[in-house]
């Protein structure tokens, strides 16, 4: 079986602004494989987040195509696209987006319940994932009772609880201090190895990006390997 999860072929993106086409991405090619970590760095407005949204099927390219597990995302109806995305992708953002009225455990359980797992199975699986991220002892605490680093750990647990093929993270440490940022990234890389999950992280932090196996630089809508980055 191929270990290829995501593939971009000639991906371009334009937006309409006042009757004009504004290009954002130009002819991008990219492959993401099982167990591989990729950092995408670039200045604000370079197109990093736009690319991540296209990789995740949250936006569609204007040109080219994106294949997820061999399926062209543009060829799918919304229901099939949602099913494929929910089954194979996890998402983490700069802000945790935990639901404040629920506990850490209930937040992490949610994707499993949406996926029609029984409550018993959801509790057991979510608790095991909270244990992996070091939050089992905080499982009954609501988001407002957790520290910033703990909230992001809970968000990562929620993204990985369904064991997706790939985790897409948009500035996941951008709202944390340096120590917490390092700890969260360490945890993500450990879980990537343990679970065999592909990992794509958009970041402006050059130091953190150096921890990934591959680093790509986004500049003026084009994507290139960083010179001297790990292969």
UniProtKB/Swiss-Prot annotation:
InterPro entries: AAA+_ATPase, ABC_transporter-like_ATP-bd, ABC_transporter-like_CS, ABC_transpr_LolD-like, LolD_lipo_ATP-bd, MacB-like_ATP-bd, P-loop_NTPase. Its EC number is 7.6.2.-. Pfam families: ABC_tran. It is an enzyme of class 7 (translocase). It is a peripheral membrane protein. ATP binds at residues 42-49. GO terms for biological process: lipoprotein localization to outer membrane; protein localization to outer membrane. Belongs to the ABC transporter superfamily. Lipoprotein translocase (TC 3.A.1.125) family. This is Lipoprotein-releasing system ATP-binding protein LolD. The gene is lolD.
């Amino acid at each position: 079986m191929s270990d290829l999860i995501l593939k971009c072929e000639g991906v371009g993106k334009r937006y309409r602004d006042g009757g004009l086409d504004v290009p954002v991405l130009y002819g991008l090619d990219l492959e993401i494989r099982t167990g591989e970590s990729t950092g995408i760095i670039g200045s604000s407005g370079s197109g990093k987040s736009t690319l991540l949204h296209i990789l995740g099927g949250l936006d569609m390219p204007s040109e080219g195509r994106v294949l997820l597990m061999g399926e062209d995302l543009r060829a799918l109806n919304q229901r099939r696209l949602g099913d494929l995305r929910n089954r194979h992708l996890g998402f983490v953002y700069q802000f945790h987006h935990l639901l404040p009225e629920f506990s850490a455990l209930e937040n992490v359980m949610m994707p499993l319940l949406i996926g029609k797992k029984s409550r018993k199975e959801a509790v057991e699986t979510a608790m095991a994932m909270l244990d992996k991220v070091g939050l089992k002892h905080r499982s009954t605490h609501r988001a407002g009772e957790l520290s910033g680093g703990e909230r992001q750990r809970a968000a990562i647990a929620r993204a990985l609880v369904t064991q997706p093929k790939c985790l897409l993270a948009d500035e996941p440490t951008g709202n944390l201090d340096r120590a917490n940022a390092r700890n969260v990234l360490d945890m993500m890389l450990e879980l990537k190895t343990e679970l065999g999950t592909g990992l794509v992280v958009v970041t402006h932090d050059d130091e953190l990006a150096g921890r990934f196996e591959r680093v790509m630089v986004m500049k003026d809508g084009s994507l290139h390997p960083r010179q001297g980055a790990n292969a």
